[in-house]
Amino acid sequence: GATYVIQDCRELYDMKSAAGIPGRIGCLMEKIFTRHSDVVIAANAFRAKLMVKMFGLKKRPFNYENIRRLAYSSEERARQVEQECQEFFAEEKFRIISTAGCDMTRTTGKMIEAMKDLGEKYELLLIGDSEEEDEELAHRIIQYYGLTNVKILPRMDQDHLKYFIDHSQVGMVTYHQRDLNNKYCASGKIFEFLFEGKPVVTSTNPPLKEFCEKYGVGIADDDYAQAIKAVAEHYTKWQDAVHYFVNHVHVERNNHRLAQKIQNVLEEKQA
């Protein structure tokens, strides 16, 4: 039977941001490959539009949001995690959680600096793998401002991460905007927080800004301290908006819709 090529473009780099000759060759290969694929999938509508221009595509790629919902591996594991971690949350604080670790390209330095304006009622949890120099820099910023409201934690398994998000108040989703891949970042990270009932504060990258404005589930603002305060002040209102949104998102339907579109294209090609 016929063979079809379906390309899922998770990353998006152009010649300008490609690293050296190997990177440029990679970009060129991707351009050729993408133009000859039967179906192309982009991470969001912004990228789909951009790819038409970049790769000279006849059709706009399908866009597919990677919607991820955290779940406990078992009820017993959930109880274990609760026993291990409940002490960590004994003190009542307004907790902000980021799963970018100390990654400075994800504007973590700015996030830490924002904590000096928020004071002791707030706490920032940085969770995830970090480059050694990024972690050192994070510690230096914390030391410089004499902060006691920032905690750096290692990467966690899904059970622990779910518990930590569940017991925090706001999720941070931030990226730099110096290359296309980051500027037009996929907003999948947002869903991890929303499914736990938490509003988000994000950087102003176009997909994140549009998402926050369209669904009212958080604030996209480059002044992180101001945005966090704004969410904290009307926290119940933001939570209600998140619950409304989550009740109207259907992961399986989202997946099925894309599968149906792909099937239609391939059937047309067979005809």
Can you say where each PLM-predicted feature lies in the sequence?
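Active-site proximal beta-strand in glycosyltransferases
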Residues: G1-M15
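Conserved donor-binding/catalytic core segment of Leloir-type glycosyltransferases
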Residues: I41, V81-R106, M111-M115, L125
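Nucleotide-sugar-dependent
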Residues: T105-R106, D157-F164, G171-F191, V201-E210
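Nucleotide-activated donor-binding/catalytic signature segment of Leloir-type glycosyltransferases, i.e.
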Residues: G128, E135-Y163
